[in-house]
Regions:
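N-terminal loops that bind phosphate or other acidic moieties
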Residues: 1-74, 78-193
């Protein structure tokens, strides 16, 4: 690519701030989820509690640099949050049934009662995103990310069915986007695909 590395503070999978880098060249940014929410960077390994928020922070940094093409490398994550943390970092607001705003993780995706994505949509207007992954797993089902990859990230026993159900509820809550979200590769990086 022949670009340069830039960076700043971004959250790891446990939402602890750390230094993290990503690549830039011309009007493009190249961001790997493994640099923020990767398994090696995450101290407490359990996808019920890990977040993609740091990747969203890096995207926001790239947007502030004027980057209009964002390439997301989705491999090696510690997460199973459907990218909700990333969306929250970009300005998407998630509310529970009491109207309290929160940042969803794999264990709380099912608690989302409403979503306000207006601020996020405005922040990414005119930006092209390309997600790159090396898996073909869908979001849901026995071949989906919860059952196939969550055990590698620290999930055990009933965690798998909890993660799957929360992911299904998130899928239902985001159908207003009118986009099929259960395609091959959607399960990459804990549903961030």
């Amino acid at each position: 690519i022949d670009g340069v590395l830039v960076g700043g503070k971004a959250a790891d999978g446990n939402l602890f701030k750390k230094n993290a880098t990503y690549g830039v060249k011309d009007d493009s940014a190249y961001i790997a989820i493994a640099n923020t929410s990767g398994l090696p960077q995450t101290l407490i390994k359990n996808p019920l509690y890990t977040s993609t928020y740091g990747m969203g922070e890096q995207i926001k940094q790239a947007l502030n640099l004027g980057k209009k093409n964002i390439y997301l490398f989705l491999g090696g994550s510690s997460t199973n949050d459907c990218g909700a943390g990333m969306l929250a970092a970009l300005g998407c607001k998630f509310f529970d049934e009491n109207g309290e705003q929160f940042i969803p993780v794999g264990g709380t995706l099912g608690k989302i009662a409403s979503i306000d994505d207006a601020e996020m949509r405005k922040s990414i207007e005119g930006v092209r995103f390309t997600a790159l992954c090396d898996v073909k797993n869908p979001l849901l089902g026995k071949n989906g990310c919860s059952y196939v990859f969550a055990p590698q990230k620290g999930a055990k026993g009933d965690d798998l069915s909890t993660l799957e159900e929360n992911m299904r509820l998130f899928y239902e809550k985001t159908k207003y986007l009118r986009v099929d979200q259960n395609f091959d590769g959607a399960g990459a990086a804990g549903g961030t695909g």
